[in-house]
């Protein structure tokens, strides 16, 4: 079985202009997992575990509802509940940070859902906060190779980010490159610009300990 899951070596940029200007850039990696490949991927990689401790671990309880149902089932149920027609064998691709040595740090995850013809159907941006709360935002409007959504935030993220702002999501469909932007607006004024961009690498044991 040829696996399509991959790792992205990413550059994260965050630039806030209000209430006080602050900017940082740092490098991270993100896993891009076809959820149908999760079990064979863990068999292929010595340092990745599914619902068990390892150097890197993927726990279903960390995604969407805090229960141990399969993440794919939770994704499909969520989009159906929100008006998207989906069949059980649709593909779900998840871009996320795994647990590292059991520690959870995952500010945002991105889900991309594909139909039987591998055409993108919708995306979900799941935003987390410092209290380990999570809120999903469903993106169904596609502009070219991107899903777009501007929506009232209605979610506490940090002391520097008020509840009455808008999120503006722009999620490019993952391929050889990852290109994701999340901005915040106060009316017409953009007060936060953030992006995650990176290049795809193969999943190997060597890459996981590099």
Protein language model annotation of sequence segments:
Residues 1-210:
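Mature, function-bearing regions of proteins
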